Regions:
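Catalytic nucleophile-loop/oxyanion-hole region of alpha/beta-hydrolase
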Residues: 35-37, 64-95
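Conserved alpha/beta-hydrolase
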Residues: 45-68
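Short beta-strand/loop motif that positions the catalytic acidic residue
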Residues: 208, 214-216
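Short alpha-helix in the alpha/beta-hydrolase fold that links the catalytic acid
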Residues: 210, 224-233
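Catalytic active-site module of serine/aspartate enzymes centered on a nucleophile-bearing elbow/loop
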Residues: 246-292
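Class I SAM-dependent methyltransferase Rossmann-like catalytic core
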Residues: 322-389
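Class I (Rossmann-like) S-adenosyl-L-methionine-dependent methyltransferase catalytic domain
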Residues: 361-364, 378-383, 406-419, 425-444, ...
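A short, conserved alpha-helix within the catalytic core of class I
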Residues: 477-489
């Protein structure tokens, strides 16, 4: 066994272990349950059944030999896993498709989130008693913890879980009780965030289609195995198995019958690695098509219809008091003008109450996510600019649907020598943007007015970009044939080894409200067909664009990805 540290997304040093590494072997990543650490995985890592695999494990933040404290943000754990996968690729030349992940309890939720939100092309996953919903025996405990964390952000809760409800094995109970690296506490905010993430992932299980094995403990006093069953049923995976481990407690890898667990995992791992990769296609995810049709045809209970109808009526009556709502009602809540207002994030309104309403409007989770998306877009855009500059090339940026220009003016301020073309279909947005260009005296930046979904028009732009931005436009059009035409047009004019930045919206908690209350720039209901991250990445891969980097907000709503056009 060897040990080391890898740098995570925020510069944190995360401790990891490696067993039996040999080039060209398939790889297993095993992630420990909460409170534990990677050293406790030594038995499974050295079991004869797995001797033909590279085995890696790391200590989660605040666990084992990782000195970085626990993050209260669940998504940080998912980002760590994504960075570990990248580290294995750069350090050990291990590709994603050669990785299978095994995870127990909370780690099962982390892996599921990685698969759902980042869409890695891994071979499969085994979830052992995944903690999609934790059993809290005190009534309203989750609500109380959530409220308390508002008052005390660093709230720490002592775990009620004893070794005797984790395993029947007396030796394993004793080892757990005497291990000085076992942590008995959990961050209160992390617990609340974990519960929210688990609920989101179970509700959206249909977005996952990789091979999945779930081993559920029959006598689990820590998490609800009924929720695991719901998750399993909704999975879109063609290869999936659910096994209830008779008489098992929650700590499945440490139970008396754990060698039976090893056998189930080994059999499923072999099966997963033998599968041929799915052919690339532009076919949409069927679950999201059905979801869109339900929204479009308003298939819902009568009381729900009445609720949204009342919200829409209220918006029309008092929405004009809020500056942001008034702009949305006039131009469409998805319009460039409306988004500019959201980006500026300065509450305005009439008669005092309007400003209060506007502040609440701007603080909606979707708009908060939109502002984070802008930050993430600028982060990856600057990274791409520096990559182009380091190769001695002139930076040439194209935004295929840039609205009024917005963040590209920020880029022009920081990098005055870059050449920028902003394509935009709405002429009123162009007028606003050109006014800013004139006022600021910018050079080497211009607008064009073409249909970004017509591949023939890209030649008319008369530009050869090495960075192209697709921001917020694909989310408004659910037709993959249409979006594919745009990507074809981009690739047809791009420089060799150019970057493509594209945004996604794999999940949204307010999708129904948006559809039935807010109007679009087309003066219609703003009904969207969301794309899973894997579907969006598939459109890019179909056009020989390989994703290299991705950022996502803490809520799991908006993503920004960076890919490179393969020569």
């Amino acid at each position: 066994m060897n040990t080391g540290y890898f740098k995570s997304f925020d510069g944190s040093d995360i401790f990891y272990r490696e067993w039996n590494f040999q080039p060209n072997q398939k790889t297993l990543i095993i992630i420990h349950r909460g409170h534990e650490h990677s050293e406790r995985l030594h038995e499974i890592a050295t079991d004869a059944q797995f001797e033909g695999y590279n085995i890696f494990a790391y200590d989660l933040r605040g666990h084992g030999y990782t000195k970085e404290p626990v993050s209260p943000i669940f998504m940080d754990n998912v980002r760590d896993l994504d960075m570990f996968s990248k580290y294995l690729h750069h350090q050990y030349q291990i590709d994603e498709q050669d990785i299978f992940v095994i995870a127990n309890s909370i780690a099962g939720v982390i892996v599921t989130s990685w698969v759902h939100d980042f869409a890695p092309a891994i071979a499969g996953m085994a979830l052992l008693a995944p903690a999609f919903e934790i059993k809290l025996y005190v009534p309203f405990a989750n609500e109380f913890i959530g409220f308390t964390t508002k008052l005390k952000k660093d709230l720490v809760i002592q775990s009620y879980v004893k070794s005797k409800v984790l395993t029947h094995d007396k030796a394993q109970q004793e080892a757990y009780d005497q291990d000085p690296l076992i942590s008995k506490s959990i961050n209160g905010r992390l617990l609340v965030d974990l519960q929210s993430a688990g609920k989101r992932l179970v509700e959206d299980a249909a977005a996952i289609n990789i091979p999945t094995l779930i081993l559920s403990a029959e006598k689990d006093y820590v998490v609800k195995n009924s929720v695991q069953k719901k998750f399993y049923v909704d999975l879109e995976s063609q290869v999936k198995e659910f096994r209830t481990m008779t008489n098992f407690f929650h700590g499945i890898l440490f139970e008396s019958g754990r060698h039976e667990v090893y056998q189930y995992i080994k059999t499923f791992v072999v099966k997963s690695f033998e599968l041929e990769p799915n052919e690339l296609s532009l076919a949409p995810d069927l679950f999201s098509v059905k979801e869109y049709e339900n929204l479009y045809y308003k298939v819902m209970p009568t009381m729900e219809k009445l609720n949204f109808a009342f919200q829409k009526w209220s918006l029309g009556k008092i929405g004009t008091l809020s500056e942001g709502m008034a702009l949305g009602l006039k131009y469409g809540f998805d319009s460039g003008i409306s988004l500019d207002y959201v980006y500026h994030n300065q509450a305005k309104g009439k008669f005092g109450i309007g400003k209060v309403i506007d502040k609440g409007y701007l603080e909606a989770i979707g708009w908060r996510g939109i502002r984070i998306r802008k930050q993430h877009l600028l982060t990856l855009l600057e990274k791409n600019i520096q990559d182009i500059q380091s190769s001695g090339r002139k930076v040439k940026i194209l935004d295929i649907a840039g609205g009024t220009g917005n963040y590209l003016f920020d880029i022009k301020e920081r990098y005055p020598d870059v050449e920028i073309v902003i394509n935009e279909f709405v002429e009123s947005n162009i007028s606003l943007g050109e006014k800013i260009i004139h006022q600021k005296g910018y050079s080497h930046i211009r607008f064009t007015n073409f249909d970004c979904f017509d591949p023939k028009t890209y030649q008319l732009i008369n530009f050869e970009p090495n960075i192209t931005i697709i921001s917020g436009i694909f989310e408004l059009f659910g037709d993959n044939q249409l979006t594919n035409k745009a990507v074809q047009g981009i690739v047809s004019i791009s420089e060799e080894n150019s970057h493509i930045l594209y945004t996604g919206q794999p999940w949204h908690p307010q999708l129904k409200m948006i559809a039935f209350v807010l109007n679009s720039h087309q003066k219609k209901d703003w009904v969207m067909r969301r794309r899973s991250q894997k579907e969006l990445d598939r459109i890019m891969a179909f056009n020989h664009i390989k994703k290299e980097d991705m950022l996502i907000d803490d809520y799991g709503i908006f993503t920004v990805s960076s890919g490179k056009v393969k020569g």
